[in-house]
């Protein structure tokens, strides 16, 4: 498309008020024009306004200067925080709004668990939430505290969210995990429902891919300079034993991952690792190896359910190594012929794992939730899916 045509079209949309434009100065002082769809423009402005509202209000509970609580909690749980972890907990006591960011294995979960134990005696109403059911389930497992999805916290329904500025949340402390996954629209709805006197802690990895929806909320909040930020960069010993963690940090630093330990035919007696690299360039052979690994080698070595505990990721839909072809091959191998239903060139069978791809507020099932087909009726074209435990 010719750039002049594109600019002309944008100008016309701006005149018709179908787009919004905002002028800003970038880091080098050069003025730039940002173009938004109106609903995202309004949502982004409300996010900023609500952050300022919460920051500039008195908290329900004041912890300022009570740093002795940290040492008491350390003795209570038998844990010695490292200096940066301690800085994060001190900041949580001192500030109304805080961002804690760090890569895998840097102790984010440990800090959340520690803060919950420290603050709960003084703040009985604490809300812990994440953008997806799987993320919320993971928090519950690692902290021992009940967590929910943001949608469930806001009491989502087909009529919208029941919690808002007029009917705010009850919690005095709200902790959001996996904040990098939250898009501008959802953050807007969430912050609208946060009471002015509540404390807010946003936890996440700013170096992860941004949300699927519009916006890079966590990054923008950090770069705004208005919210205290604690960055965790130390990989703890247990995490340092994980090849996934080590290689994730290598990729982040622009380094080549450690491929020194490859899966070999004679590795039956070798120690179990969480990261392997298999070198292969032939697409058909890649599929063969994926099938072998997912249905035999890895489930047997690690005692995993090949369907519910295993996930194959691919960057494309089409082609031999695309998701459509791989799903068919995996289905044939893991869940062979039975009662099935065909829809849009996709064959569904009882026992298949499926993923919800859009929010269903009436059924309280949300985008990204995983379930398993428990019944299908080819005559009525109906599938019955049992989703994981409600969170």
Predicted regions and their residues:
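Short amphipathic alpha-helical interaction segments
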Residues: 2-14
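ASCE P-loop NTPase motor cores of helicases and related translocases
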Residues: 7, 20-174, 228-237, 244-280
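Conserved nucleotide-binding/hydrolysis modules and their immediate coupling elements
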Residues: 77, 183, 327-391
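Catalytic P-loop NTPase motifs of RecA-like helicase/translocase cores
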Residues: 154, 182-183, 209-210
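Short basic/glycine-enriched coil/helix segment immediately N-terminal to the Walker B
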Residues: 159-172, 183, 188-198, 307
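Walker B catalytic acidic pair
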Residues: 178, 204
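Conserved helicase motor core of P-loop NTPases
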Residues: 206-354, 360-362
């Amino acid at each position: 498309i010719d750039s002049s045509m594109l600019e002309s079209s944008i100008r016309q949309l701006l005149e018709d008020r179908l787009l919004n434009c905002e002028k800003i100065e970038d880091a080098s002082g050069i003025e730039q024009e940002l173009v938004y769809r109106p609903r995202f423009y309004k949502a982004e402005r409300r996010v900023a306004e609500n952050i300022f509202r919460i920051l500039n209000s008195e908290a329900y509970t004041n912890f300022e200067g009570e740093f002795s609580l940290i040492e008491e909690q350390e003795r209570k749980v038998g844990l010695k925080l490292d200096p940066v972890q301690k800085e994060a907990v001190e900041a949580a006591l001192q500030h109304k709004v805080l961002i804690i960011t760090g890569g895998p294995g840097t102790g984010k979960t440990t800090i959340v668990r520690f803060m919950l134990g420290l603050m709960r005696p003084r703040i009985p109403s604490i809300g812990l939430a994440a953008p997806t059911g799987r993320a919320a389930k993971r928090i519950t497992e690692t902290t021992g505290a009940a967590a929910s999805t943001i949608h469930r916290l806001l009491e989502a329904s087909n009529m919208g969210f029941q919690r808002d500025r007029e009917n705010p949340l009850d919690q005095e402390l709200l902790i959001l995990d996996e904040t990098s996954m939250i898009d501008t629209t959802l953050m807007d709805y969430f912050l609208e429902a946060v009471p002015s006197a509540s404390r807010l802690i946003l936890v996440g990895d700013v170096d992860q891919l941004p949300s699927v929806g519009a916006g890079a909320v966590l990054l923008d909040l950090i770069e705004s300079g208005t919210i205290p930020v604690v960055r965790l960069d130390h990989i703890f010993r247990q995490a340092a034993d994980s090849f996934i963690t080590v290689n994730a940090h290598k990729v982040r630093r622009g380094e080549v991952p450690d491929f020194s330990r490859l899966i070999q035919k004679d590795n039956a007696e070798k120690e179990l690792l969480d990261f392997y690299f298999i070198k292969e360039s032939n697409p058909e052979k890649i599929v063969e190896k994926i099938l072998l690994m997912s249905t035999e080698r890895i489930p047997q070595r690690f005692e995993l359910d090949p369907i519910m505990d295993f996930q194959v990721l691919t960057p494309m839909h089409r082609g031999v190594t695309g998701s459509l072809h791989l799903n068919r091959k995996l289905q044939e191998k893991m869940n062979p012929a039975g009662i099935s239903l065909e829809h849009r060139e996709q064959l569904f069978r009882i026992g298949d794992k499926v993923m919800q791809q859009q929010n269903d507020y009436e059924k309280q099932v949300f985008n990204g939730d995983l379930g398993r087909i428990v019944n299908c009726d080819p005559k009525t074209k109906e599938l019955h899916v049992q989703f994981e435990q409600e969170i």
